[in-house]
Regions:
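N-terminal signal-anchor transmembrane segment
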Residues: 1-52, 71-77, 414, 446
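Aromatic-anchored transmembrane helix interface
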Residues: 61-68, 83-109, 119, 123, ...
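Long extracytoplasmic/lumenal interhelical loops at the membrane interface
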Residues: 148-152, 291-360
Length: 448
């Protein structure tokens, strides 16, 4: 019982980091900042235990790159004389995310006396499933939604005006992008379990993949990016394994796990689609493109039609080089002279690449891209066995920027922090020996 309570608390902390909100009974700060404070405390404890102060070179590099983003942003708004400081404080944001990620890894360590990529991914998967369940309860139980709205602040007024589903901090493209990143991580674990011939362990992973795919798309169709990349990875990995083991009679694919879960999930979805108008509308929104394709012969959605009009590019060299200094709508600038965009962001575009170029030019776009790539590199170098997860995470980030400007640094920072933590193995051994009274020579599960 105590163990499960610890796991639930740890899951709650992971959710606080991955899907931050502001609790109304503590409106001073959002949960991301609170997790960053917790991570800072954990870091201080580590340093005190080790009795030395050392900063990994990789951490300095990624903070340097984040600092470059802030400096370019500062140049952009000063040269253009705009008040939009959206990315001027990017260095601070990077520090907060990394500190919070370290706190998450330490929380998992304190609960399980070990921390690894599969553990982190499993926590992310079930936190995303939890968010999907909360979103469904919000839609079907008004009293529950009233309770959630009275407890947390997450811009729910705007979400309700837009008619969008939301969980506990998971909504719109921010939630969808993190669902997508989690899906590609789950797909990697599924391949790993298939190679290990552990079919039982695949069932909860397949279940979480399907739940996040179905309900996650109802929340934000950006989730489809992770669905596509994850399924493509599963497909090619399965082809590779079949080719390598085609004469091995004892080899079993993961098809059985998928069939088992789908035999349960498919009838449930069909039943509610045919009996609940509300669920039908949610399904048609989440998979609008597929419904349009099968009913009209054309794959299209309302958002893709709008997106086509948002690919707007600068018409002068100066904007390409240093941007216009606007990321948000220029109506927020009282000194702006000209016709402002009536709705949406600057130049009426929500496309990530366009917004970055209009804000701080190509140099800024390259700098923030370098942050994402290097975060993936840190994780891949420190955790080489799982490098495909980080490669797919970075890939998802750049695909998502074709639609919105949301980045996946929170996802990548988790594994970058885990990679940093692997350098403190001796400290982890000492901590476990102190807490469990084990001999220091006894082996300790460590991140791979």
């Amino acid at each position: 019982m105590v163990k499960w309570l610890k796991i639930l608390i740890t899951g709650f902390l992971v959710s606080c980091f991955y899907f931050p909100v502001i609790y109304k009974f503590f409106p001073v700060s959002n949960t991301k900042n609170l997790m960053a404070a917790f991570g800072l405390v954990c870091l201080l404890v580590v340093l005190i235990k080790k009795r030395e102060f050392s900063v990994p070179k990789e951490l300095l590099v990624i903070l340097f790159l984040a600092g470059v983003v802030s400096i370019i942003s500062l140049f952009a708004i000063n040269i253009n004389q705009t008040p939009d400081r959206t990315y001027v404080t990017y260095i601070r944001s990077a520090i907060i995310w990394l500190s919070g990620a370290f706190g998450v890894c330490c929380a998992i360590w304190l609960t399980h006396k070990r921390v690894s990529v599969p553990l982190v991914v499993n926590y992310l998967a079930w936190v995303c499933v939890f968010q999907c369940v909360i979103a469904l309860l919000n839609e079907f139980i008004p009293a529950f939604r009233t309770f959630i709205d009275a407890t947390v602040e997450q811009g729910q007024g705007m979400l309700q005006d837009l008619g969008r589903m939301y969980g506990l901090g998971a909504s719109l493209d921010v939630g969808g992008s993190r669902f997508a990143a989690t899906l590609v991580a789950i797909s990697f674990l599924l391949v790993q379990k298939s190679e290990d011939r552990d079919r039982i362990a695949q069932i909860p992973l397949v279940f979480s993949f399907i739940v996040i795919t179905v309900i996650g798309n109802m929340i934000a169709r950006t989730t489809l990016v992770g669905v596509g990349v994850g399924l493509a990875y599963l497909f090619f990995a399965e082809l590779r394994m079949i080719g390598l083991r085609k004469f091995d009679k004892d080899y079993h694919t993961s098809l059985g796990a998928w069939l088992l879960v789908l035999l349960f999930a498919a009838p449930v979805c069909v039943f509610f689609y045919n009996t609940s108008l509300q669920f039908q509308e949610m399904m048609r929104f989440g998979f609008e493109g597929f419904f349009n394709y099968f009913e009209q012969g054309e794959w299209s959605t309302g958002s893709t039609s709008t997106l086509e009009t948002m690919y707007v590019w600068p018409d002068n060299l100066k904007t390409w080089l240093i941007g216009d200094g606007y990321f948000e709508n220029q109506r927020n600038d009282p000194n702006y002279i000209g016709v402002a965009t009536r709705r949406g962001f600057y130049m009426g575009t929500d496309v990530g690449y366009c917004r970055y170029i209009f804000y701080f030019g190509i140099p800024g776009l390259l700098a923030i891209s370098a942050v994402m790539i290097y975060a993936g590199v840190i994780a891949a170098q420190g955790l080489p066995k799982y490098s495909h997860i980080f490669l797919m995470g970075v890939l998802c980030n750049f695909i998502i920027w074709l639609k919105v400007s949301t980045d996946l640094f929170p996802f990548l920072s988790l594994f970058a922090a885990l990679a940093f933590l692997t350098s403190d193995i001796e400290f982890l051994k000492q901590l476990r020996a102190e807490e469990e009274g084990e001999d220091e020579e006894e082996s300790v599960p460590v991140p791979e």
